[in-house]
Amino acid sequence: PGSAQPLMQVAKALVPLFEAGRSIDAAALRTAMEQAFGASDTSGSWIWKDAYEAAEVAQILMLSRYGALMQRQVSAPRAFLTMIERLAGLAPSHTRRSEDSVRLQQFSTPLPLAAIVAQAAGFRDDDLVLEPSAGTGLLAIFAKIAGARLALNELAETRRALLGHLFPGAVVSDHDAASIDD
């Protein structure tokens, strides 16, 4: 389960819901996944972990499109964080975990926390940002908005392929982040 192309299709289908300020509930997510995969989760064509990742990708697409504008429209980082919290509040929560996600320790950074980390890091356009366990790119998107160059690492094949779609100018590698200093 979980090839990148249908997950990108799902993410693109979810973006208009985010743009309209609508919550992505399980029914909307299931419908988008069934349309992209041509089957339900009960068929084994996709799993809920994939659906949650597609919703994360939709948030990243939103920030790719509107993140820099959102930052310019606010006078303080707290106001930007409030906007990020609103966006994250529209996304579904990860209520189901796959055995692979537990085994690979795939626990996504919540979008508001990623925004706080990015603010603390103070990404600039002359930075090269290494994300050793990039996941779907929830932290990397903030570095991209700042204009930084990206070196993204992700062990999971589907997530790595998603990163390639989302951050075409980034170097994407597949090292085991537990031994990335070797």
What does each model-identified segment do?
Residues 1-182:
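Class I S-adenosyl-L-methionine-dependent methyltransferase catalytic core
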